[in-house]
Amino acid sequence: MTKNTKLNIAFYDRYMMTVEEAAVYFHIGYKKMRSIVKEHEGAKWILYNGNRIMIKREQFEKWLDNQSAI
């Protein structure tokens, strides 16, 4: 694979996604998604890749299933 090659993997097949991608996928506003991440620092569904915040999709889905409001 070359340096500039990008894989096009559907959101539902991804293990992790960026905050922006998660906001689109879960139909949550970007600012609200950032707020949720900030409120839950250290949650198991958050992974820090350097300074980039990644959301573990399946774990976030499980957390979201248990919420009555966000």
Predicted features along the sequence, with ranges:
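Detector for methionine-enriched segments
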Residues: 1, 16-17, 33, 54
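Polyanion-binding surface elements
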Residues: 6-32
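Major-groove DNA-recognition helix of helix-turn-helix-type DNA-binding domains
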Residues: 25-54, 59-62, 67-68
